[in-house]
Amino acid sequence: MNTLTKRLMCLGLAALLILGLTACGSPKQAARLSIDARPDAPAEIPAALDIDWNARYTFAELEAQLAAMAEQYPDITELYSIGTTWQERDLWCLEITNEKIPSEEKTGIGVFANIHGGERESAASAMYTAWWLTLCSDDAYVKGLLDAYTIYVIPVINPDGYEQSFVINTRPYLRPQDANGNNIPFSDPYTELDGDGFIATLYRGKADDTPSRDLPLFGMESPDWDENGVLGDDPRTSGIDMNRTFDYQWNRYDIETKDTQQVGNVNWTSAGTAPATEPEIRALQQFLYTHELDVLVSLHTGIQCVLYPWCYRAYDAENPDDAEIPFMKATASKMAQAFQDYTGRGFYSMSSNEDYPTAAELIDYAYGRYNIHAYTIEVYSPGKSDSGDISDCKWENTMPETKWVFYSRDEIRDTLGLDPDAITDKDGVGLAADEGLWFYTSSTNQMVNRAPEEQDVMVRGCRDAILTMLESEPSG
């Protein structure tokens, strides 16, 4: 279908949705109803799918929930793995559609989440969308969607990072690394020592110091598994950002740009050794190659915003490669408004490059390689806004207070089980006679085992943003 035809179909369907009329033609179009007809919640919830959307679930629990959806709704779902991770976890895809209508008559929709392990609210949002579609599948509005669209939900692209984030918020995935050069990967992982259940960053100092992150960094909470004296110097992380490793404009920003505004920190140091080196990314790229998608959304956290291409450069009206960007810009604005309308929290939209320049992201890969309309929804920014600026939108929830605890040399020995004379910083400098360790635990690290307040509202708002995206695409 050419771009003009797609756009005309979009306009026609949009008009029908606004008027609340049914479309003539195929059965899938005839089933479409007005946006106001969306059910907010399922009429009935099977016991196996009675999910608390304000809870935090392990990856194994998410797998069980996906399996329950497939078991309860076999006529509209198919659950399969598209690949495995470094630690042999499956990358599950739940395909949702009316299987009685041929796939070539439908529009392909991708809902992908949690490429960054610690952004687990994104996984919850994708899971909720799948749950809502299956449990509401007898509703006339949802029936119309499933007649017209095939929806592919991959809720966790980074299962290894997801699981590691129950220990400490972990953005990368877990390709084995040997950070301290002892030829043993992950030989000194972060481990809780003081009984509070959280991982702390360690600073050297004195008991009467004012604790702050300006104190000299000493290490991370660990029992010194590798016995080299440096605490936490070989953690379970690759240091590589999977969302900088797709095979499109890979490593465009190299070391010469490292001092450019934010570019160096988010690109050349974290893009890996080559594009698509990781099994998770290879699996996702193969999925996009073998499945015809018209639009996809990648769910994240960090800000509250809907982003669209490009990531690697600004929009150029004279460049034919940018022909679809005005459409995506308009759709992103509507998606952000839908999220804001449901949740009562602030959301905005912009091109990803305006947020900050990156390269080799999923949305650029999808649009650049396959002309797939592609969006990023950043579903959650923790805490409270204090500036009133649109770019400072927050979830307006109460986060735990950051925590500082001082351990003297005696307490390091007696409480933490470490020899204060045997531990050093990364430069080999030990503690002075009058020094101890300040343990700093961030608000984020105190949230590893629990979801933010009103996550149930968040996931519903994200659903509405996704439906707004979906309704912008012509069916068939």
Name each region found by the language model.
Residues 60-71, 127, 131, 143, ...:
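Solvent-exposed, polar/charged alpha-helical surfaces in well-ordered, non-transmembrane soluble domains
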Residues 78-83, 90-95, 108-112, 119-122, ...:
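Structural recognition of the beta-strand scaffold that forms the well-ordered cores
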Residues 44-96:
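A non-catalytic alpha/beta surface segment that caps or lines the substrate-entry region
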Residues 2-12:
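Bacterial N-terminal signal peptides that target proteins for export
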Residues 29-55, 246-476:
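C-terminal accessory segments enriched in acidic
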Residues 106, 120-124, 128-317, 442:
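Active-site/substrate-binding loop(s) of hydrolase catalytic cores
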Residues 25-27:
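Bacterial signal peptide processing site
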Residues 20-23:
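C-terminal motif of bacterial Sec signal peptides marking the signal peptidase cleavage site
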